[in-house]
């Protein structure tokens, strides 16, 4: 067999016997063991490429990959070369602390993901040399004959050669929520993947029936493999925070190195000692660099990650925490994300009228009501009773309990009918005793119905369900609520069907009749005209309970929500209307687009159409990927949610991919940045809120650290330029940076979220971290800080203090001003006093720790010796606190003035 045959042939377009010949196999005996071994060597194992995880060393080294860290490493090395070992130790200590924190948090995220992974190896039933074997799916090769039965996971792409009532749930691959009834009939070559009824795809689940198929593709050549390739090809988009921090760090690095070079140059021009000037230039660089920034970013994101984990959202990559906060569009998969992925009967129509079934999910608790919400006793309505019995007994599904959760084994549609009967009091196990099945006509795509014969005491009864029009052909009468039979009103039944389908419901008809003859005589020839129509059962995969409120919250936050699904447009529209994506009135033109309509759009029309529409139905994985790319090209920050294999490429392409942890596939989880452990779309609302809070706190830290670091650097530059003694020594600057960044700045990461955080629009993705307001605030505070430090330093010297005492005063002034300024940075929109002193207890703890540290460096002899400090008296402290208070008043006034001007007269 040619190695290219399997990959290039449209097997769905050929008759089954031609596919068998093409692959040199046998429809009953399969391949020989020898031929299978040769093909395994030629084609390789039936596996997808394994994603290589970063090694321990690579993950450690990644923590040092930051421009600011590079500068600190160089500065530390040069400082050590100059034999300033204390300074070098402090610099390297800051770098190591940052690396440790980052590594620990990344490891925690990876461990959380590992806990979600289900390491399951599938097996397949294969016929070789006429004998059935069970073997690992990895050993399958093109041409193998595979047997399928209900509950099996399809192990490779199969061209079916025979089947009986075979149905396959392809929702993980195509997004369609209802199982696909398979057959072996050849199809046109251009038939879309979702409509290829004669192919069973790798990774999908057999829900009913049995069959056999020839393997036509394995591993990377399967449709699942094609999606895997799309995942690998999808561009990993930098998060808004990552991109901004990268630019910001490069800008700071260049600016700080420029200032250091300027300092060194000025010192040389003034003929100062080259080594001392060089040391001062390094001190300026170290002082001006916000070395706490990488650590602050890591810790702030880690805190956000921990908060999200408590709300059942596991973050795989730390920057994803902030990305949700800047999201402008959420693309949500319908099945299993906005909906329960549990087909549920919503309404039962009988010739007597419509009856609503309350409740969702598989738990057997329900109330049957009429349209006026009045309870309907089952035994008081014969048609309702027999419709429920038909749905429960003419059924191959099973309702099982897994711990506290109820699950369906088999076809979801049959499961829905089984569940509603159980909810109405008809226990499936008891029915197997009171109405035992003695014969059956299984469902097939040609027959379009299923009928079963049951023993009812000494008589027999026929129960059936199927497509409405097919069941109408089988029914000659209809049953009333009193059990009386009357002529079938076909037109009324069709109108009721149209009414139910217009609500996005899938409708099946039920019927019953008296069984004649023996079970051996029961076949499809005895059914036509012998049944009485008992009702219509209308079902859907209902929206999650909190989906509508979550969508509304996203809209209030200025975030557009779009549904992307492989399901039919009618079903998608109905769900979208229920959750608030579409108005209850007729959807506006262009608000719902199908995959075919998307394919017909020109390149110029495509971006605007995608931006305008709210629902995308019958879309392929490639189209999902292109949709995300088009939205990103329009300037959107895109979050994509999903749980299926078909979602994986778009999950990876999106700025943040959100996978479902409970019902999601492993492919989707691996492609995602965040995994929701409760599979609840509403959790995304909480994640967006946390993400916005994270960015707020990062902004507060930057607002605090930039002026203080710049002030430290400018003090040295000014001293070199003027040619006087340094007000603060390099070692003292390192002390300030090391202690205040940890004890003061990092405490801002624990600030609670601001009021109204979910009522403001998303942040402009193009807005830089270094805004005009921040530049002005930085210049204001750093100027005040430098001026006050110089004033106090000069005052102390002029009033008889020694150089050590004057520098100690300036050192403590820097720290106290930074502590006071910290409170001003707790909110960028409100007064610090309105927040409450104890709203963030970490601030109080940090300030207290910093106070103890300042006492130690000022009054402990050992610290005095290392840092060249000296004790200062109470009068100096009074001056320090007076200056800090004055600066705080100036900053508060600067914060309030814009709001005062903005108020109407």
UniProtKB/Swiss-Prot annotation:
EC number: 7.2.2.-
SMART domains in alphabetical order: Cation_ATPase_N (SM00831)
One BP term from GO: potassium ion import across plasma membrane
Ligand binding (Mg(2+)): 643, 647
Cell membrane recorded as keyword: yes
Superkingdom of the source species: Bacteria
CDD domains (UniProt xref): P-type_ATPase_cation
Transmembrane segments: 64-82, 88-104, 248-268, 281-301, 716-736, 738-758, 778-798, 808-828, 842-862, 872-892
Membrane topology: Multi-pass membrane protein
Induction info: A member of the dormancy regulon. Induced in response to reduced oxygen tension (hypoxia) and low levels of nitric oxide (NO).
Leading EC class: translocase
Subcellular localization: Cell membrane
GO molecular function, one term: P-type sodium:potassium-exchanging transporter activity
Catalytic activity: ATP + H2O = ADP + phosphate + H(+)
Keywords (A to Z) from UniProt: ATP-binding, Cell membrane, Magnesium, Membrane, Metal-binding, Nucleotide-binding, Phosphoprotein, Translocase, Transmembrane, Transmembrane helix
Keyword Protein transport: no
Family the UniProt entry places it in: Belongs to the cation transport ATPase (P-type) (TC 3.A.3) family. Type IIA subfamily.
Designated name of the protein: Probable cation-transporting ATPase F
Organism of provenance: Mycobacterium tuberculosis (strain CDC 1551 / Oshkosh)
């Amino acid at each position: 067999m040619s190695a290219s045959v399997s990959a290039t042939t449209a097997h769905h377009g050929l008759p089954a016997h031609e596919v068998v010949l093409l692959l040199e196999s046998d429809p009953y005996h399969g391949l020989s063991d020898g031929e299978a071994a040769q093909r395994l060597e030629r084609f390789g194992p039936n596996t997808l490429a394994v994603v290589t995880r970063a090694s321990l060393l690579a993950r450690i080294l990644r923590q040092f990959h930051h421009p600011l860290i590079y500068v600190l490493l160089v500065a530390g090395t040069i400082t050590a070369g100059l034999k300033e070992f204390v300074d070098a130790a402090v610099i390297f200590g800051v770098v190591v602390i940052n690396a440790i924190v980052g590594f620990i948090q990344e490891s925690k995220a990876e461990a959380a993901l590992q806990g979600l992974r289900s390491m399951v190896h599938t097996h397949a039933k294969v016929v070789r040399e006429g004998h059935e074997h069970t073997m690992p799916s990895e050993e399958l090769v093109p041409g193998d004959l595979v047997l399928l039965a209900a509950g099996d996971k399809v192990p490779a792409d199969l061209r079916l050669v025979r089947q009986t009532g075979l149905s396959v749930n392809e929702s993980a691959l195509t997004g369609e929520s209802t199982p696909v009834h398979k057959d072996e009939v050849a199809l046109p070559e251009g038939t879309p993947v979702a409509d290829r009824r004669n192919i069973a795809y790798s990774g999908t689940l057999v829900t009913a029936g049995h069959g056999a198929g020839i393997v036509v593709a394995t591993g990377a050549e399967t449709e699942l493999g094609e999606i895997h390739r799309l995942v690998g090809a999808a561009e990993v988009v930098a998060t808004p925070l990552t991109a901004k921090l990268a630019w910001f760090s490069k800008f700071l690095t260049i600016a700080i190195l420029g200032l250091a070079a300027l300092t060194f140059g000025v010192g040389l021009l003034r003929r100062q000692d080259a080594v001392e000037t060089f040391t001062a230039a390094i001190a300026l660089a170290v002082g001006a660099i916000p070395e706490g920034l990488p650590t602050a970013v890591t810790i702030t994101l880690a805190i956000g990650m921990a908060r999200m984990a408590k709300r059942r959202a596991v973050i795989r990559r730390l920057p994803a925490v902030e990305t949700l906060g800047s999201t402008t569009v959420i693309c949500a998969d319908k099945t299993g994300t906005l909906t329960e992925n549990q087909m549920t009967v919503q309404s039962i129509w009988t010739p007597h009228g419509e009856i609503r079934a309350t409740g969702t999910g598989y738990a057997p608790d329900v109330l049957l009501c009429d349209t006026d919400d009045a309870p309907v006793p089952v035994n008081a309505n014969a048609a309702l009773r027999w419709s429920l019995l038909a749905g429960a007994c003419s059924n191959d599904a099973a309702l099982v309990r897994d711990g506290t959760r109820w699950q369906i084994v088999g076809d979801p549609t049959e499961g829905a009918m089984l569940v509603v009967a159980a909810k109405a009091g008809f226990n499936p196990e008891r029915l197997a005793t009171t109405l035992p099945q003695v014969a059956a006509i299984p469902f097939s795509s040609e027959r379009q119905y299923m009928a079963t014969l049951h023993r009812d005491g000494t008589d027999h009864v026929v129960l059936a369900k199927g497509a409405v029009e097919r069941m109408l052909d089988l029914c000659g009468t209809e049953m009333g609520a009193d059990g009386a039979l009357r002529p079938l009103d076909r037109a009324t039944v069709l109108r009721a069907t149209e009414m139910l389908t217009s609500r996005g419901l899938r409708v099946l008809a039920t019927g019953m009749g008296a069984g004649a003859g023996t079970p051996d005589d029961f076949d499809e020839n005895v059914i036509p005209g012998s049944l009485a129509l008992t009702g219509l059962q209308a079902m859907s995969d209902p929206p999650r309970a909190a989906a509508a409120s979550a969508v509304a919250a996203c809209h209030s936050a200025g975030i557009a929500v779009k549904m992307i699904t492989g399901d039919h447009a009618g079903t998608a529209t109905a769900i979208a209307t229920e959750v608030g994506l579409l108005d209850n009135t007729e959807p506006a033109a262009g608000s719902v687009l199908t995959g075919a309509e998307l394919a017909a759009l020109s390149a110029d029309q495509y971006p605007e159409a995608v931006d305008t529409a709210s629902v995308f139905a019958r879309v392929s994985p490639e189209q999902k990927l292109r949709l995300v790319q088009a939205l990103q090209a329009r300037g959107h920050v895109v979050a994509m949610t999903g749980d299926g294999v078909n979602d994986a490429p778009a999950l990876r392409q999106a700025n943040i991919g959100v996978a479902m942890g409970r019902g999601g596939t492993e492919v989707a989880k691996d492609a995602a940045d965040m995994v929701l452990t409760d599979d609840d779309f509403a959790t995304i609302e909480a994640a967006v809120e946390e993400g916005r809070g994270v960015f707020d706190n990062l902004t507060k830290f930057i607002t605090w650290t930039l002026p203080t670091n710049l002030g430290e650097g400018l003090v040295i530059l000014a001293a070199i330029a003027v040619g006087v003694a340094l007000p603060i020594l390099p070692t003292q600057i390192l002390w300030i940076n090391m202690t205040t960044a940890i004890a003061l700045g990092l405490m801002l990461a624990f600030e609670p979220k601001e009021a109204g955080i979910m009522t403001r629009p998303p942040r402009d993705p193009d807005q830089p971290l270094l805004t005009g307001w921040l530049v002005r605030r930085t210049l204001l505070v750093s100027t005040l800080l430098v001026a006050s430090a110089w004033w106090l330093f000069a005052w102390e010297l002029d009033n008889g203090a020694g150089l050590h005492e004057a520098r100690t005063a300036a050192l403590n002034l820097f720290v106290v001003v930074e502590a006071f300024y910290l409170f001003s940075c707790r909110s960028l929109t409100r007064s610090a006093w309105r927040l409450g002193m104890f709203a963030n207890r970490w601030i109080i703890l940090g300030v207290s720790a910093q106070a103890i540290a300042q006492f130690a460096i000022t009054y402990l002899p050992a610290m005095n010796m290392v840092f060249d400090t000296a004790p200062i008296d109470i009068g100096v402290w009074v001056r320090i606190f007076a200056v800090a208070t004055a600066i705080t008043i100036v900053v508060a006034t600067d914060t309030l003035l814009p709001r005062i001007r903005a108020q109407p007269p």
